């Protein structure tokens, strides 16, 4: 069997080498010719899996090691009779930890604020519910908005109420453009007008959920602290926007070693189910041991002392700013940052909690 895989997928050879010939390709530039005689295609979010890519091919299975599916033309896949799978929730823990790290980087005193600090979570799916749990471990008050999901453990509120009451807002929704609850440009001029000027905004979901022009106007007006891991016009990022952000990172919020490995394992399991193979591999067997920070110490004390050792978000911010050339970060530089990213470990690898 011929298997075409994005060259940046983790542990591809470990999970798939026994099934056939794996050809590693650059995901963003994948062509119909690359996949024409392949039976399986393994991708990330940078590959648009559409009708022009998959029609008249030997493909029987497409696996995307990602939470989202907006890069997959599901209708075209099903029309062609191609089984598809994604990895919903694979890096949810990593994203939740990213958000908390960003907040503590901006204001370390949040560790002491308990319920005086209100975190508003927009989207209560795989990431949102984990973030809520982790935030409550720190004593923060959590409010959430999701038209499709209610969490018993938090206060569920309207979108407008969340915008007005939260001290920080973190976005965790898929990108949708149709329907009553479309998320495209959910954060527009009207939403920014409802936010308190000192409310922190974090987007680690999908870039176009935030209308960039409205965001720029809002920061100019309020001097709001904004953290972006995703961008509306990604992979190209303007220097104008970058200079306004409190923190910027190159779409790596979910880039933990565990998250990457878990994503590949999830599409491996779906692959095995499709082709009738036994599922007998686990990513945990491939991960090196880490220093234990948490098990013998208080959670807040560890985060106060070790947070930048567990994940140095300031370095990621510096790296993306160093890529500015002629007024912008270009696609090649952005992709290289992601390709060469030194995968961090989740808190649990250091003996810490996980949701």
Swiss-Prot record:
Top-rank taxon: Bacteria
Binding site for substrate: 45, 66, 255
An annotated Gene Ontology molecular function: protein dimerization activity
InterPro entries documented for this protein: D-iso_2-hydroxyacid_DH_PdxB, D-isomer_2_OHA_DH_cat_dom, D-isomer_DH_CS1, D-isomer_DH_NAD-bd, Erythronate-4-P_DHase, Erythronate-4-P_DHase_dimer, NAD(P)-bd_dom_sf, PdxB_dimer_sf
Gene3D superfamilies: 3.30.1370.170, NAD(P)-binding Rossmann-like Domain (3.40.50.720)
List of residues binding NAD(+): 146, 229, 254
Pfam short name (any one): 2-Hacid_dh_C
PROSITE patterns the record matches: D_2_HYDROXYACID_DH_1 (PS00065)
Pathway(s): Cofactor biosynthesis; pyridoxine 5'-phosphate biosynthesis; pyridoxine 5'-phosphate from D-erythrose 4-phosphate: step 2/5
Nucleus in keyword set: no
Active site: 206, 234, 251 (proton donor)
Cystine pairings recorded for this chain: none
GO biological process: one example: pyridoxine biosynthetic process
UniProt entry keywords in alphabetical sequence: Cytoplasm, NAD, Oxidoreductase, Pyridoxine biosynthesis
A Gene Ontology cellular-component term: cytoplasm
Enzyme category, top tier: oxidoreductase
E.C. number(s) listed in UniProt: 1.1.1.290
Entries under PANTHER family matching the protein: D-ISOMER SPECIFIC 2-HYDROXYACID DEHYDROGENASE CATALYTIC DOMAIN-CONTAINING PROTEIN-RELATED, D-ISOMER SPECIFIC 2-HYDROXYACID DEHYDROGENASE FAMILY PROTEIN (AFU_ORTHOLOGUE AFUA_1G13630)
Function: Catalyzes the oxidation of erythronate-4-phosphate to 3-hydroxy-2-oxo-4-phosphonooxybutanoate.
Record-stated family: Belongs to the D-isomer specific 2-hydroxyacid dehydrogenase family. PdxB subfamily.
Protein name: Erythronate-4-phosphate dehydrogenase
Organism: Acinetobacter baumannii (strain ATCC 17978 / DSM 105126 / CIP 53.77 / LMG 1025 / NCDC KC755 / 5377)
Gene: pdxB
